[in-house]
Amino acid sequence: MNTSITARELFDQQRDKLALRWVAGPKGEHREIQANSNNARRPSLAGYLNVIYPNKVQILGTEELAWLDSLDARQRWETIEKIIQVQPLALAISKNQSCPEDLRAAADESNTPLWISSKRGHELLNHLSYHLARTLAPRVTLHGVFMEIYSIGVLITGEAGSGKSELALELLSRGHRLVADDAPEFTQIAPDVLDGTCPELLQDLLEVRGLGVLNVRDMFGDTAVKKNKYLRLIVHLTRPMTEPTPSGYERLTGDSGSRHVLDLDVPLITLPVMPGRNLAVLTEAATRLHILRTKGIDPAAMFIARHSNLLERRTP
């Protein structure tokens, strides 16, 4: 999914938190940053003023403004020209410092957004860098029910009618929490982290066939819903046409594998849906098994090792 953010959107999202004022270049509100993970040489999203390797948001603190003041007239004009020519998303001055008139005029003439904040430079840098990195991170929407089970994020998937929503309802009644139904959105906020959230339209809602749309917060209380969770496991429900006949190895290890989501391989456990199976208990067990495996505890491997040792002892 291609993502972007404009200067106006960034300003509106951070105005209150960073006490921002827009003092010049109002016509540049449509300038935007496009997410482009394939461009290894793209500029940094936010940073202190850098003329050689410019940032998309250039922050001017006390030292940066003092450096500008130390330049002679020609050098100062050339430096401001360089700052403007690369078309940054915005310029941000920290600590409510007064804006130099020549910089303000250049920003107005070039339609470069110029903001002033009461925050210190490092606060601007931290907040803007984090917000931009998260906003522009790769993201994808997957079909399924995303829940918190035993404190880890579990995505329940399966074809239509496989019982995902009914399973989610049973898990809710057992004390687990809903993050998103039907269309959870996952953002890769770090090389090994997928953060799952719920679209605003579907917040707190769960659709169950025969019952319609349920408000989970109203039915089960505030603790039954979760704003976001990291995706750690996928449980896939499948309806086999015939009784499955797993091999001996599958009977030991279960039907496990992985699913590629963005740049990560997420562990996946497949559960056959058949009459009489308690899917809620099986899903809880699958989650506990995954937690054990992350700690290096694998019951199947332990059994195979015991079996091998027993055969070795009995071999003459």
UniProtKB/Swiss-Prot annotation:
Cofactor: Mg(2+)
Coiled-coil positions: none
SUPFAM superfamilies according to UniProt: HprK N-terminal domain-like, PEP carboxykinase-like
UniProt binding sites for ATP: G158, E159, A160, G161, S162, G163, K164, S165
Positions of region (Important for the catalytic mechanism of both phosphorylation and dephosphorylation): 206-215
E.C. numbers: 2.7.11.-, 2.7.4.-
Binding-site residues for Mg(2+), renumbered to this chain: S165, E207
GO molecular function: ATP binding; magnesium ion binding; phosphorelay sensor kinase activity; protein serine/threonine kinase activity; protein serine/threonine/tyrosine kinase activity
Gene Ontology process terms (BP): regulation of carbohydrate metabolic process
InterPro entries in alphabetical order: HPr(Ser)_kin/Pase (IPR003755), Hpr_kin/Pase_C (IPR011104), Hpr_kin/Pase_Hpr_N (IPR011126), P-loop_NTPase (IPR027417), Ser_kin/Pase_Hpr-like_N_sf (IPR028979)
Keywords associated with the record: ATP-binding, Kinase, Magnesium, Metal-binding, Multifunctional enzyme, Nucleotide-binding, Serine/threonine-protein kinase, Transferase
Active site annotation, chain numbering: H143, K164, D182 (proton acceptor), R251
Catalysed transformations (reactions): [HPr protein]-L-serine + ATP = [HPr protein]-O-phospho-L-serine + ADP + H(+); [HPr protein]-O-phospho-L-serine + phosphate + H(+) = [HPr protein]-L-serine + diphosphate
Region called Important for the catalytic mechanism of dephosphorylation, residue ranges: 272-277
Protein family according to the UniProt entry: Belongs to the HPrK/P family.
HAMAP family: HPr_kinase (MF_01249)
Subunit structure: Homohexamer.
Described purpose of this protein according to its UniProt entry: Catalyzes the ATP- as well as the pyrophosphate-dependent phosphorylation of a specific serine residue in HPr, a phosphocarrier protein of the phosphoenolpyruvate-dependent sugar phosphotransferase system (PTS). HprK/P also catalyzes the pyrophosphate-producing, inorganic phosphate-dependent dephosphorylation (phosphorolysis) of seryl-phosphorylated HPr (P-Ser-HPr).
Additional remark text: Both phosphorylation and phosphorolysis are carried out by the same active site and suggest a common mechanism for both reactions.
Notes concerning its domains: The Walker A ATP-binding motif also binds Pi and PPi.
Name under which the protein is recorded: HPr kinase/phosphorylase
UniProt source species: Xanthomonas axonopodis pv. citri (strain 306)
